[in-house]
């Protein structure tokens, strides 16, 4: 059957709307050859122009539109459509002002409300966003949604809702932004892989700004592949630019390469504005190398960096395009590079606008800190920047979000810590160690109301985890989708309130007033200058240098495998070999990290705070801490607020499947609590709901179950119960959490370190939710050791001994040296 030109045009539009651009191109080419009516020829030309623009041929696209506008006999509606198409072409070429002009002409010429007019409102809103005119952008989106609803087009209305989320992102409301985008994705995702990729690119920006760069970059790389396969060069290049911006924070060398690829692609597309943006990111990436990050890694320095003339010219070009935020970030990055390399010429800092993006404001504070004449001035500048970051992040109650937002403060933390170390003053170093630890602890979560939808999604995730390979289950498309929905739901539902007692930092003298003669605080501080420890007692404080840090750092990567092997291989000829290897490694770590420190204090009780670079160290197994009582706090300030004596009257126990001596372990432990008739759940009774219900009724919760730490998404770490895995996300659903939690499980004492100080995992999730103390191990623990040691520990807990004292006493009585350690306010 031979299709008419009108039918081919209709089919071409259907293909375009579904993202099938190759099929659309063929249908429209045939339609153009058969069209006689000038109005139809013009409409076909307009749609072909859209495809040409997507194919990277903006000149051809513009010519198609202007030639069509010159035809006699075209309708007002077609004229409006062509003006709208010219606006979209201008938008893709990086000319938002021209786009607004053409789109306004198209909107004014459109005779009545329709889907086409709504699409022009949608595109004009994007142009307003690029110009920073967010109120105008929001107004256009509201008009677009009204037109789409009148036209009964929910799919297009979802696109508008998604863009409302992008406006919230630009306004700094990450939670609201992700909420709109996830809601829109439910409708958009079914359209095509192109629609899904378009939405994913914007969601990746939200995740990047939230510090979740791994997830953001995974989405962007997938989108780049989709756009490349569909020959959508503009969208592909924009996604590469976004990927480079994300990599800039942690992999500047790769960021420079990706930005260069985007720059080349934009040059081919003749998009001057977009090319300048990519060139700016590439220049910043080249200037960002050669620093020590918060994990102790030295980022490689670029062989060649842009000189002052290149930076000045590029910044001026960005200014000319109205991208003053990009220009300012580039200028500040260049000044910072010059200061760090001893080439500062005293160029005054550019004047910031009140509306400057947070990234630019924080960069300015970092430059002021680097240029400061004295360490005191440097600390003051860095502190002001961190206070501004804290004000922005204050409303976020989610642990997932709080810990990741610390990304934005990394440079300022490094500057402040380095300045504090330069003084050699224990009080200054302690203050900045607390600033680093408290950056993600300024607020605590309000307990959310019951959420059946979140519960349903977590239940489906439990089923998927049971069915899929343990090491890759979150890569499954459905699991990944559910994980994103759970994250959005949890971000939105967990509000924040001030931390107890206002969340104030305790200073060194304030901490010392809380220490008795037999208690000391060890605050390990990592900075670009290395590792040091502030040792504080009731009447004295000093800074201890740890010159062996570099050697200790090389011992950490093999530590976990030694610990896991030692717990798994308990007999046979290899057991002694493995044990000797582990003992040697632990002795070396103790000598390098603790011997210089413990030589300064005879205190039996030690409050220990550590940076993320020391995550995973089994402190309780290090020889220099034998015979001492230790508690490992998120921060000394939080310990100070929660150190009041515990009153533990009731206990509950749960055993997961396939734990060899699990029932024996909890039965032995529960015998210490017989006067209160402790609840014990095992077998089919040890369910998610059963344990969750028990949690609210006990002071001490002890779970003996197999556990697994999920590094890519630590809040999907969990404990295996009878009907699935209890995730970290489940903890925020609990109306009340116990005072003390004992996790006798493989790995769940581990944490994934995000951006330096703040670790996240099951242990941190319980503490964040309100538990005073968590007893857990960062590695595999032999079932025999867990059974005997924890049973003895419960005797102390039931007798009123503090958790840290109870664990230390149990270790001494049983002679078992295991990696269990006390987190939080253990004494």
Q: Which residues make up each language-model segment?
A:
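Amphipathic alpha-helical protein-protein interaction segments
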Residues: 301, 308-312, 323, 343-350, ...
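Amphipathic alpha-helical segments of tetratricopeptide repeats
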Residues: 29-33, 66-71, 104-111, 142-153, ...
């Amino acid at each position: 059957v031979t299709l008419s030109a009108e039918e081919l045009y209709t089919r071409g539009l259907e293909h375009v709307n579904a993202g099938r651009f190759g099929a659309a191109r063929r249908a429209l080419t045939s339609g153009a050859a058969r069209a006689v009516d000038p109005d139809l020829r013009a409409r076909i030309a307009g749609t072909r122009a859209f495809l040409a623009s997507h194919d990277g041929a903006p000149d051809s696209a513009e010519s198609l539109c202007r030639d069509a506008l010159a035809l006699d006999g075209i309708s007002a509606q077609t004229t409006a459509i062509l003006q709208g198409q010219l606006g979209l072409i201008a938008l893709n070429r990086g000319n938002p002002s021209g786009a607004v002009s053409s789109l306004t002409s198209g909107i004014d010429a459109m005779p009545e409300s329709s889907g086409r007019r709504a699409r022009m409102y949608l595109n004009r809103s994007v142009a307003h966003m690029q110009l920073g005119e967010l109120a105008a952008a929001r107004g256009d989106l509201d008009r677009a949604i009204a037109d789409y609803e009148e036209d009964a087009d929910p799919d297009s209305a979802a696109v508008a809702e998604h863009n409302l989320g992008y406006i919230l992102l630009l306004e700094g409301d990450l939670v609201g932004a992700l909420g709109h985008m996830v809601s829109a994705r439910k409708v958009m995702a079914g359209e095509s892989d192109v629609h899904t990729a378009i939405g994913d690119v914007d969601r990746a920006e939200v995740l990047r700004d939230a510090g979740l760069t791994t997830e953001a970059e995974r989405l962007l790389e997938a989108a780049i592949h989709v756009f490349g396969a569909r020959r959508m060069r503009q969208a592909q290049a924009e996604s590469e630019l976004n990927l480079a911006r994300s990599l800039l924070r942690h992999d500047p060398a790769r960021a420079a390469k990706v930005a260069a690829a985007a720059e080349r692609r934009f040059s081919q597309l003749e998009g001057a504005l977009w090319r300048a943006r990519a060139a700016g990111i590439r220049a910043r990436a080249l200037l960002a190398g050669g620093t020590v990050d918060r994990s102790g890694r030295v980022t490689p320095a670029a062989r060649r960096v842009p000189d002052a003339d290149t930076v000045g010219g590029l910044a001026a070009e960005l200014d000319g395009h109205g991208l003053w935020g990009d220009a300012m970030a580039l200028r500040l990055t260049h000044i910072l590079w010059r200061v760090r390399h001893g080439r500062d010429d005293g160029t005054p800092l550019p004047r910031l606008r009140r509306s400057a993006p947070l990234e630019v404001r924080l960069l300015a504070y970092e430059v002021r800190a680097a240029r400061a004449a004295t360490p005191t001035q440097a600390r003051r500048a860095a502190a002001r920047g961190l206070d501004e970051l804290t004000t922005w992040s204050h409303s976020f109650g989610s642990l997932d979000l709080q810990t990741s937002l610390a990304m934005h403060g990394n440079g300022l933390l490094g500057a402040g810590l380095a300045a504090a170390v330069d003084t050699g003053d224990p009080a200054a170093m302690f203050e900045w160690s607390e600033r680093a630890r408290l950056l993600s602890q300024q607020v605590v979560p309000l307990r959310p109301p019951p959420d059946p939808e979140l519960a349903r999604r977590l239940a489906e995730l439990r089923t998927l985890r049971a069915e899929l390979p343990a090491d890759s289950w979150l890569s499954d498309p459905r699991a990944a989708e559910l994980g994103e929905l759970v994250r959005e739901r949890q971000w939105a539902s967990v509000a924040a309130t001030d931390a107890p007692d206002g969340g104030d930092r305790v200073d060194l003298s304030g901490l010392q007033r809380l220490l008795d003669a037999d208690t000391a605080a060890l605050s390990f501080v990592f900075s670009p200058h290395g590792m040091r420890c502030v040792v504080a007692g009731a009447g004295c404080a000093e800074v201890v240098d740890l010159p062996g840090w570099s050697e200790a750092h090389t011992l950490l990567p093999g530590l976990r495998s030694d610990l896991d092997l030692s717990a798994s291989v308990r007999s046979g000829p290899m057991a002694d070999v493995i044990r000797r290897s582990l003992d040697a490694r632990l002795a070396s770590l103790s000598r390098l990290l603790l011997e210089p420190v413990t030589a300064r204090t005879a205190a039996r009780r030690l409050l220990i705070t550590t940076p993320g670079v020391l995550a995973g160290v089994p402190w309780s197994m290090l020889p220099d801490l034998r015979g001492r009582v230790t508690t490992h706090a998120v921060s000394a300030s939080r310990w100070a607020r929660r150190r009041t004596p515990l009153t533990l009257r009731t206990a509950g126990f749960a055993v997961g499947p396939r734990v060899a001596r699990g029932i024996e372990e909890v039965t032995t432990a529960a015998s210490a609590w017989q006067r209160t008739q402790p609840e014990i759940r095992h077998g089919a009774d040890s369910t998610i709901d059963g344990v969750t219900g028990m949690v609210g009724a006990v002071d001490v919760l002890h779970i003996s179950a197999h556990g697994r730490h999920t590094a890519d998404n630590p809040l999907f770490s969990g404990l295996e119960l009878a009907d699935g895995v209890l995730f970290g996300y489940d903890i925020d659903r609990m109306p009340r959490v116990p005072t003390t939690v004992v996790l006798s499980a493989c790995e769940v004492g581990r944490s994934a370190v995000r951006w330096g100080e703040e670790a996240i995992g099951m242990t941190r999730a319980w503490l964040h939710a309100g538990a005073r103390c968590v007893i857990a191990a960062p590695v595999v623990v032999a079932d025999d050791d867990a059974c005997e040691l924890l049973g003895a520990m419960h005797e102390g807990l039931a007798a009123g001994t503090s958790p840290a004292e109870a664990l230390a006493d149990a270790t001494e009585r049983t002679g078992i040296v295991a990696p269990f350690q006390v987190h939080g306010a253990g004494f």
